[in-house]
């Protein structure tokens, strides 16, 4: 079966470098400040900022809690972050692009679906569960980034 793709985007009212810095910082920014409550038990295992960061987490969706571990890469530093779940075939890409109002941020997830009836159910449910989760995350990102800009603070130490 072809992979399942879910993509949500919105304009964030902050400069791209600030927003990218928040997303790349798993110690103080990304997970601490913007993740919806469906994510829990977030633990940075290695790194913490940018490529090489490894994070463990729990995600509760559709009444099920899944534990996972993901590794962060930066295929295009300053523009694209890529989270790859280490057990499974799930990748989530965070794309930050300049826009007149600040920047446009897109969260895109691609995951492999199961074969047969389970795959059909996954194809129906994954977008319905992930899209609202990502919309909430992007709204939280917008609020947090706007607060940082208003306070004239960098996204995190070492990231401009």
Residue ranges: model-predicted function:
Residues 1-49, 160:
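Hydrophobic ligand-binding cavity/cleft-lining segments
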Residues 8-10, 59, 68-74, 91-98, ...:
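Hydrophobic/aromatic beta-strand elements that line small-molecule binding cavities or substrate pockets
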Residues 12-14, 61-63, 76, 111-115:
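Beta-strand elements of well-folded, non-transmembrane domains
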Residues 18-20, 31, 65-67, 93-94, ...:
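Short acidic, gly/pro-rich beta-turn/loop elements at beta-sheet edges
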Residues 22, 75, 132:
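Conserved catalytic core of Hanks-type protein kinase domains
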Residues 28, 41-88, 104, 136-160:
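Glycine-rich portal/gate segments that line the openings of hydrophobic small-molecule binding cavities
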Residues 82-136, 152:
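Beta-strand/loop substructures that line and gate deep hydrophobic ligand-binding cavities in soluble
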């Amino acid at each position: 079966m072809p992979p399942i793709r879910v993509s949500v985007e919105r304009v964030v009212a902050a400069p791209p470098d600030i927003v990218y810095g928040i997303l790349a910082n798993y110690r103080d920014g990304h997970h601490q400040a913007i993740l919806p409550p469906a994510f829990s038990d977030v633990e940075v295992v290695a790194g913490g900022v940018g490529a090489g960061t490894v994070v463990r987490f729990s995600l509760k969706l559709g009444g099920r809690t899944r534990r996972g571990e993901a590794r962060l890469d930066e295929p295009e530093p300053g523009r694209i972050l890529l989270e790859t779940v280490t057990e499974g075939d799930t990748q989530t890409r965070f794309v930050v692009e300049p826009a007149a109002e600040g920047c446009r941020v897109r969260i895109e997830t691609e995951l492999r679906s199961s074969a047969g009836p389970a795959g059909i159910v996954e194809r129906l449910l994954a977008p319905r569960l992930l899209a609202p989760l990502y919309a909430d995350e992007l709204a939280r990102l917008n609020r947090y980034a706007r607060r940082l800009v208003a306070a004239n603070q960098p996204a995190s130490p070492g990231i401009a």
